[in-house]
């Protein structure tokens, strides 16, 4: 297969059957590039309990995929939480990362958008009982937010200091994203020190970033990065 390969990192509670993952797999087949999509522990086809997971464990899953299933440099394409995990991979394994694309990347969301939005009663409940439930617009079932997710993700917050990368970074973000506001993307851009970092804001795109034009934009970015 052509080098570099591409690894797709999905979002929280998503699975590798999502629109973006399947689209990129087809793109890779057509272009002759190696491509990997996978499920984190407790997601999709993978074993394990979702509520026992955190950024710490899902980052380890991604690290295992990078180390054991790929060779050479990789383009990391991270959606939502996967954008946070892609940043961690680039930070810990810079020699293996060709470039990084964040799609509605959600670094530090467990702290900035979950914990910081909880009132005292919710914080007390999650600490004492181990979890709370929060409505989700993506499924009828509410999200189960665990104490594990909050506590163990704190070891891996990335927006508390500068992120120094030598690889190119592309951030794609929609204006109609109800989960990750555009400010998160601009804040991430501010924290990045990379010789080649760009943010593209797409008017009208939502958090799923899965319309035909959004998908084409993702593959266009990959094709441009391949030439670097």
Question: What is the predicted role of each segment?
Answer:
Residues 12-25, 183:
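The serine-hydrolase catalytic nucleophile loop
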Residues 44-69:
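Catalytic nucleophile-loop/oxyanion-hole region of alpha/beta-hydrolase
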Residues 69-80:
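Alpha/beta-hydrolase fold nucleophile elbow
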Residues 83-94, 100:
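Short glycine-enriched nucleophile-adjacent loop
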Residues 96-201, 206-228:
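The alpha/beta-hydrolase serine catalytic core
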């Amino acid at each position: 297969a052509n080098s570099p390969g591409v690894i797709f990192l999905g979002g929280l509670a998503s699975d590798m059957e999502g629109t973006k993952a399947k689209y990129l797999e087809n793109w890779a087949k057509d272009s002759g590039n190696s491509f990997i999509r996978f499920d984190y522990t407790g997601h999709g086809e993978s074993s394990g309990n979702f509520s026992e997971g955190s950024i710490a464990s899902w980052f380890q899953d991604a690290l295992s995929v990078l180390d054991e299933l790929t060779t050479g440099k990789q383009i990391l394409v991270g959606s939502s939480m996967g954008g946070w995990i892609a940043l961690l991979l680039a930070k810990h394994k810079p020699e293996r990362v060709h470039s990084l694309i964040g799609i509605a990347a959600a670094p530090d969301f467990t702290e900035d958008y979950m914990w910081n939005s909880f009132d005292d009663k919710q914080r007390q409940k999650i600490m004492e009982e181990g979890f709370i439930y929060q409505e989700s617009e993506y499924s009828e079932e509410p999200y189960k937010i665990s104490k594990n997710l909050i506590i163990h993700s704190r070891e891996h917050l990335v927006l508390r200091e500068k992120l120094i990368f030598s690889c190119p970074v592309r951030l794609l973000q929609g204006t109609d994203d109800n989960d990750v506001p555009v400010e998160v993307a601009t804040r991430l851009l501010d924290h990045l020190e990379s010789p080649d970092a760009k943010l593209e804001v797409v008017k009208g795109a939502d958090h799923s970033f899965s319309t035909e034009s959004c998908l084409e934009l993702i593959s266009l970015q990959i094709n441009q990065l391949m030439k670097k």
